[in-house]
Each structure stands twice: as C-alpha cells, then as structure tokens.
Amino acid sequence: MRALAYFGKGNIRFTNHLKEPHIVAPDELVIDIEWCGICGTDLHEYTDGPIFFPEDGHTHEISHNPLPQAMGHEMAGTVLEVGPGVKNLKVGDKVVVEPTGTCRDRYRWPLSPNVDKEWCAACKKGYYNICSYLGLCGAGVQSGGFAERVVMNESHCYKVPDFVPLDVAALIQPLAVCWHAIRVCEFKAGSTALIIGAGPIGLGTILALNAAGCKDIVVSEPAKVRRELAEKMGARVYDPTAHAAKESIDYLRSIADGGDGFDYTFDCSGLEVTLNAAIQCLTFRGTAVNLAMWGHHKIQFSPMDITLHERKYTGSMCYTHHDFEAVIEALEEGRIDIDRARHMITGRVNIEDGLDGAIMKLINEKESTIKIILTPNNHGELNREADNEKKEISELSSRKDQERLRESINEAKLRHT
C-alpha cells in the first residue's frame, strides 16, 4: 500500500510497500482515505520525536505495533468494507475518524501481550482522552491517514453529512480539539475571549467560539497572513510585535469589553511569554486554557497572578466522542460555516510529495502556510480541486465581465440624459 510513513526521528519517507490493513475485530471497518490534514504534532514527531510513536525497535504499549507506520490523524474518507459487528455505518458512507488509541481499544490487537492488561484509572472513569498510554491512529498505535486505506473500529468513526465536502471534513478533528477546550473551561455564551496564536488550532478556536455564542473574540498573532485570516473568520486582531510584552498585555486588557481583561483566554502558542499573557489578560475570575503542546521543560510564572484575582488555569487534551458529535452538529446547523472553515486550508498535496511539498513547507514557511492536507489521490481528488479552482476563477471572471457591462450601460444612460 502507498503511504507517507514514519520510520523514526527525522526519517519520514514515501513507500509503496506499507502493509495493507485488514479487519480483525468484528466492529472494525476499512476506510478509503480522501484527505488527511498535517498537524503540528506530525511536525514535532519529525523534528523532536518520537513523542507518540514508539522508539525504533520498540512497539506501542496499546497495540504492540512497531515502526514504520503511516502518519496522519486528521482524516476523512469513505467506508469501503465493514466487519460483521458494525451496526450503524455502511459501505459508501462518508466518515471522519476520532483517532485516539487507549486502554478501551486493546481488544483490537488480540496478539498483543498487553491485550488483557488492566485499564488505567482515567479510562476506567471514562476520561479516555487522557489515557495513561494515549496514542493516536497515525501516531504510534497504528498506521493513519497518510495512506490509501485505514482500518478503525466503529466507535471511533462518525458519519459526515453529504453536503460537507471531505476536504472540510478533514478539519473536524482539529475543530474537535478546539471544541473540547471550550467544553473543559465551561464556556458561557455571551462571554469574551482572547486567542493567542492563529495557527490551525487558534483559527479553529475562532470557529468553535462563534458557534458557542462568544460575544467578542480578539486574536493576538505576529504573522500578517494569519491575522488577515483570523479577521476573515470574524475576530478582531492584534500584532504583539508592535509593543513590548507589558504594553501589549495592558493594551489587550483595555480593548476587552469592560476594559479590564477577558473572560477566557486560549493559549495556542505554548511559550513562556504567551502562558503569562494568557493569565494576565484575564479579568477577575477568568479562565485561561492551554491548548498548546509543550516540551517537558520548566518555565517561570507567578502563582499570585492567579490567586489575587481568583483566576483559573487549565489544560485541554484531545477530544472525546462528545466533541466530534458537537462539531458535526454545528456544521449541520450552520453555526460553523463551511466556507470560513475552508479558509484554513492553504495547500493540497499528494502523499508522494508530502515530505518536501508539505511537511518541510510547514516547518520552514510558517508565516505563509496554515493547514496543508494530503491525499492518496485514488479518485482524482487533486484533479477535482484544480477543476473547482478553474470553475471559481471562470465564475469570478464572468461576474467581473457582467459588472463591467452594467457599468458601461449605466455610463451610456448617463450620457444620454
């Protein structure tokens, strides 16, 4: 099977010979992949990993699967085959995948020495998104969506409405990350929010906050192209490089409703300066949420910035089925706009060119790229996109011609009056 696979730190490459996945457990299904987004975690696995992947020569604790594995966990596709225990999905359904691999999924790998291992405390209590052995389909547990096909159990698959294009459906997983953060902090409609960092998760948080009834959203982001995109998605924007950190914090607090800071802040950058800004830009009793993935290193912050104002600071990890279902419902109801969501996609590349044409581009050109999605192009997806772009350009040209014609007619009328 063709795939863009992880062989180890700094070693991602295309292969024609990845092992074809097959149904093992009765509730599994085969998904024909159309699109799969590249996540920041994928980039970190390349530059700093392995993080979720096992070390070379080792296997994953949940599945006992070794390297190499196809990367990619933001996937959308069509059901190709179903196991005898699949109840609610059928061949031909469009689906997205919740890619977590946890204690609850051990049964899928009956040959693993850990198949009967006791569940961790978090999984026992239903908090499987913070499983002690958490991995991802496409990042350690099993091969993911930078491949032609994936096998997944039905409980991790969600049907997508027919009107949602599969390139946008590939954004449902990162949007579920954002939705989970809003749920974790118990966001209240009518509140105000500051987002620090306008990468894919920061931009997705704009969409999730709008859907949740946020009154006012401000985004702090140094890159011009990302600020412009945040504006298109309905946020006010600020360039933090315009002033020193203290002046930026004072200014951001002043432009919040009431002039005394925001009800909620979302740190999507993961730097010492952004963590402290997220706390200090809160109003009293506000809540700061960390969505960023940090390295395991210590930083400095003042606990009294929290205590004196009875503020809260919390983390948010992954998602659960509630978040996938909520995002799909918001798309169905129009609370998340498909066209606005599609603004996040800045590139479409086939898996053969995924390393140089996408992963390295995201690493080296952060200011001009947001989200690149990959495809095995089994059904001419890239050709379809090219045809759609030509059609849009043609329609735009036609509209401009019509506008010019109307202007000429109006000018002629004015000359004869």
From Swiss-Prot:
EC number(s) on file: 1.1.1.303
The organism's taxonomic lineage, starting at the top: Eukaryota, Fungi, Dikarya, Ascomycota, Saccharomycotina
Cofactor(s) of this protein: Zn(2+)
Residues that, per the record, bind Zn(2+) 2: 120, 123, 131
Phosphoserine modifications at: 63
GO biological process assignments: butanediol biosynthetic process
Protein name (record): Probable diacetyl reductase [(R)-acetoin forming] 2
Keywords from the UniProt entry: Cytoplasm, Metal-binding, NAD, Nucleus, Oxidoreductase, Phosphoprotein, Zinc
